[in-house]
């Protein structure tokens, strides 16, 4: 006598991630000094006396702390066949990424303290279906969907201009929107083990919204390139394949 069973499990999970990062770039302008008489390898030992040559406009010192809380509800569902093996497996992940960022940024002798709290819902749905219980290894369908959102680098919200390279100007953009992406994946595996016949097909598609990029403006009169972060829509990638053996 055949029978089918349904199983459902809904656990709650929580994870925490802490990240601390220090970075600095002291920039010195020794164009009109006698320091050119020293070998390059000797300059590091003279760092204490180099303060008077510090280019504060293009030097920065930053400290960044990130606290990430991820409460997540997970739904597991299984439809069993009469052999008590999975005929259909569904896994739905429902996490909320709550991120607290603290940035201490010093540039041009000005200290800037910024704080940002963001919360993003990044769900995922994964399914496996076995049409033939007698041929599970060579007959299965897989489906995967993921949605992700994230905020841009907090440093971009500080309004400054980097001119450390005379021919390149790097700007920030405090008005950058958040980025988002959709991913859809599909796999199909079929075969007859007795005849050593196997067919595999896969298809993956990703669509991105507000992808981060660098816009560039070139001034032909001065030869200066100006870069500024922007976001663009419509970026997508697709790859798939087919294999038979």
Which residues fall in each region the model found?
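Exposed, low-structure sequence patches enriched in small/polar residues
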Residues: 1-245
